Amino acid sequence: MITPNEFPLVEVLPHNGAPALFIDGQPVFPLLLMTGARALEDLKEIAPCAIHLLTDTFPLCWTGIGRYDFNQFDAALENFLKADPQAMIMPRIHLDAPQEWMDAHPDEVVGYADPAAWSGDTSWGGARHPSWASRLWRNAASEALRELVRHVKNSDYASHILGWHLGSGIYGEWHYWNAVYYPDTSPAFVAAYRDWLAQRYPKVMPEPRTPTIEERRAASLGVFRDPANSRWFIDHAEFFHLLGDQALAEYSRVVKQETDGRSLVLAFNGYLPDLDVNREIDHRAFDKTLRNPDVDSFASPHSYTRRAPGDDAPMRGFMGSVRALGKLWFDEADERTSIAHPTQWKHVTTMEESVEVLWRSFAHALTHNCGLWFMDQGGLWFMDRTRGWYQDKAILDAFAAMGRVGAESMQRPRTRVSEVAVVASFKNAFYLADRSSGLDQVTNTLINPQLEQFVKSGAPFDIYLITELFEPTVPPYRVYAFLDTFFLTDDELAKVKALRDAGKTLLFFYAPGFLSENSISLERMRDLLGMDVQMTDSMILPDGKEQRPGFIVPGANGAVAQAGNVFYCPAPPLPAARLRGVLQAGGVHSYLETDDPLMVGGGYIGIHAASDGQKSIHNPVRADWANVRTGETLARHNTKLV
């Protein structure tokens, strides 16, 4: 039992086969609602709201140099508790610096290779913010966060704090500020980079060098940089991406220290790199962030590319990697409903469609043993009381049903049943030309269109970064599909070859293993594939875009070449129909013969129909079938449901 001014104990622990949220020793399905206190009051006028785990953006309360004002934070918390006395709340805190601080420390403010950053464009977070390399900012923001957590710890509402969602960068999502304008050229960055190089190269330190935009767009062979003469660039990219990890590590440590380890820490991080913009926006040190003992959970909005009814709207992270390290993934389900006023990203026109896309988000989280919060941007950002996105009884009834299903799921085995591992690489970006060069047409194809084909393949899959694929907690799979692993360390290459030699079915795309830490090697790629791959000046991808260089396998018939248990698709995407053949060759069970988005895990199967007509689901073992939304029994002791 906690006292009124003591933080509850909120943890992520193993439970029935997967990481789970625990509150004061009890497993809880992590279904949250992100809305404003006033909007929550409005929802209660329609029907009771079954979701009592809440989140919203709260102020850091850092008002000036050495000054803090907690009144706004206190008032916001009290308003939520008036709206829902049972609420447990996770404040989202942006570690922004006040203008006064930046005025006093101009050398600590982000600089940009592209001067257009200062044009007034705020769509990527705006230009004037502290550099993530700034030691002064990290120290001052850490102190501000420490003062805030101490204040909350001594408040009457401490027992209602679920955890702390820590953010910085664009929308608090740990994307570097104004990333499309190529940060960071500030004196703070240059000084920190010099110190880092001195530690890495203690005998002969190279001079710190910041690449120009033209140098970022350059390459040695088509899209590829030759590691032999690009070490300076690779070092810069690696250091740049470490900064967000380092800053988050300091802030998460503050929370754990000041809460005596009782509060959950969550951060946006580890997104699929699916925006097709320059890579400064990505989280390419996620393998290190994932291993931070002070961060319990990670989150992302799900994909914005396929959200219409019938689309898959996939979660936008590497859930396999997160699960392997014992952490918990959250999906930010910011689906626009039919009553939402903004038109951007809005794909539904009726309340029935609205409810179905919300259930689609829930099914993704349920079958992946993840959490989610439904994000009511209308209730957050508009004072007009007619603008809440969830102000309809059908939606509140759906939330209540989801809460019931989620609670029931915590009593069941929470294991994944996937026989396919899909593997990607964050490090390969350091060896590629910037996307704005026009030289890289293939990586976005692999992250967006190719993943869509996997969703349509009739078999569930788990997605990993290669940095976690060989963790001891990762289960064996029948098929391993390597999306963009053009760069492989010698150790990674040896482990992938061991999978091949053990008889696992492997599927590769474009240029697997073509890059090592020291060189470009076609022979290395041939040895991995066991094929006489030939390099050409260029190739045309199925979408009509030209990619340099190209690769072919002489004598191969069609889009995919085969050598025993190894399959190779040089020009992605590989269509779902052909992909099904590869998976079947690897002995993978097919649950669905149609191209509908499929979600399977934890004893649940979800389908979000992409087309009209009859659907047949095939389970590998006999089972009793029920509609969890209605409770209706559909079939007993059967392997098939129509």
Short names for language-model regions:
Residues 1-46, 409-411:
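N-terminal carbohydrate-binding accessory modules
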Residues 4, 249, 257, 261-262, ...:
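Carbohydrate-binding surfaces of carbohydrate-active enzymes
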Residues 31-33, 53-56, 89-93, 162-166, ...:
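Hydrophobic faces of well-ordered beta-strands that scaffold small-molecule active sites
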Residues 35-47, 277-291, 354-362, 469:
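Short, acidic/polar
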Residues 40-121, 140, 149-153, 248-259, ...:
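Aromatic-lined substrate-binding rim segments of carbohydrate-active enzymes
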Residues 42-50, 76-85, 156, 287-293, ...:
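Acidic (Asp/Glu)-rich catalytic clusters
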Residues 48-75, 98, 271-286, 293-297, ...:
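Aromatic-lined carbohydrate-binding/catalytic grooves of carbohydrate-active enzymes
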Residues 103-295, 301-304, 312, 318:
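Polysaccharide-binding and catalytic clefts of secreted carbohydrate-active enzymes
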